[in-house]
Amino acid sequence: LRRQDSLADSWWKQKVKVGRRIYSTSSWEEFVSDPSQLEFDYYGAIKKIEAVLGKENIIIRRFGKQYFKNGSIYEDFMEALGVRYDSRFVISEGKRNNSLFGNSHEIKRILNMLNMNKHDRLFFKRIVREISDNHTDLKGETMFSAEEARQFMEKYREGNRKLMQEYFGKDEDL
């Protein structure tokens, strides 16, 4: 489970970055006012799954480096499967899903509105990547202000707290 504000932020940025998909031309304000493509009511969704599969047959884990086993999503995933992670597992250094930083998303969103051929799209994609690479200091920035994130998360607080109590035995927010 990823905090809903973090999921919304990440999902919109990914759609804009990739382009030519739903929301790839929507402003952040448009998306966040009606993010109907995502299931943010985790408690309700998990209860539906639980009703079909049984609580004992589902694994609920928190998403975030601070929650991953040894800070590794790979190790955490293997642990969830019941597989011991060791040196036999080699993580390739191949192509990664690199993030954009700073205002690169807004530039890319505007470019997504233009009718371009593949060559031009790739040309501008490289330019946006270069702009972003020069602003890695903005890596932790999100589209929400602190107050906006608080308000957004408030909608899901009750369900999130139930999840934390039922699945993690904790009396805290997600």
Language-model-detected regions and their locations in the chain:
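Anion-recognition interface
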Residues: L1-L174
